């Protein structure tokens, strides 16, 4: 997935959920939009280098958007979780997700379920059961272990219930944890943050819901991040 043209700044603070102040190389303070509504644990430390894009829009109040954080250890994190579906869509098209490579048709954002949800991707293929794929972003990493969620997620809990219902109807149901952070080599559910999500997902997995975690890797040109892609499955620690 190609990233927009990025420019560096130093993170100062995040506030009102959707806004952040950063310091430009010339010392100017710029307010940028933050698309991530989560806790962003470990991704928003004062003094971190951030990378932002400029939409050049004349109608947006904050035309610049926070895209990545470069951590003190050198790891990169895509904090713009709106990009996760684009990342996974590209991986599905390129058959990177081996468990789903047999499907030929990809339908994004399809309404389904009894709780008025939208599935990130509905996959179809000749002679195959319909496959419902829910995408979750891995931005939280500790000791090289990727984790989800970074805050209690009632929405995520609802998605697990909906996926289990699809499985019981004879379809495939998959939670795909996508690496937006390049600093992990295995994955686990952050049960210490959301024990209910952990309980629901593990129960659903015992009943046939599938869960996979894929690592992400960034490409750079002259030290500027230019692309992000999913590279391969990592171990899922239960």
Swiss-Prot record:
Coiled coil: none annotated. InterPro entries: Ig-like_dom, SfsA, SfsA_C, SfsA_N. GO terms for molecular function: DNA binding. Gene3D superfamilies: 2.40.50.580, 3.40.1350.60. Signal peptide: none annotated. Pfam families: SfsA, SfsA_N. Belongs to the SfsA family. NCBIfam families: sfsA. This is Sugar fermentation stimulation protein homolog. It comes from Actinobacillus succinogenes (strain ATCC 55618 / DSM 22257 / CCUG 43843 / 130Z). The lineage of its organism: Bacteria, Pseudomonadati, Pseudomonadota, Gammaproteobacteria, Pasteurellales. The gene is sfsA.
């Amino acid at each position: 997935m190609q990233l927009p043209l990025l420019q560096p700044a130093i993170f100062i603070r995040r506030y009102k959920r959707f806004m952040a102040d950063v310091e430009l190389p010339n010392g100017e303070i710029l307010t940028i939009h933050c698309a991530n509504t989560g806790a962003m644990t470990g991704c928003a430390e004062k003094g971190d280098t951030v990378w932002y894009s400029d939409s050049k829009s004349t109608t947006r109040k904050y035309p610049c958007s926070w895209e990545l954080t470069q951590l003190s250890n050198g790891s990169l994190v895509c904090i713009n979780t709106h990009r996760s579906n684009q990342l996974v869509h590209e991986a599905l098209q390129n058959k990177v997700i081996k468990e789903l490579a047999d499907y030929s048709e990809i339908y994004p954002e399809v309404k389904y379920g009894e709780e008025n949800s939208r599935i990130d991707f509905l996959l179809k293929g000749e002679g195959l059961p319909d496959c419902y794929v829910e995408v979750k972003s891995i931005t939280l990493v500790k000791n090289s272990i990727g984790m989800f969620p970074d805050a209690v997620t009632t929405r995520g809990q609802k998605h697990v219930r909906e996926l289990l219902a699809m499985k019981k109807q004879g379809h495939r149901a998959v939670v795909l944890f996508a690496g937006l952070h390049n600093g992990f080599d295995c994955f686990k559910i952050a049960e210490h943050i959301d024990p209910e999500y952990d309980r629901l997902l593990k129960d659903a997995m015992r009943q046939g819901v599938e869960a996979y975690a894929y690592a992400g890797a960034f490409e750079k040109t002259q030290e500027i991040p230019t692309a992000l892609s999913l590279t391969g499955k990592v171990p899922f620690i239960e």
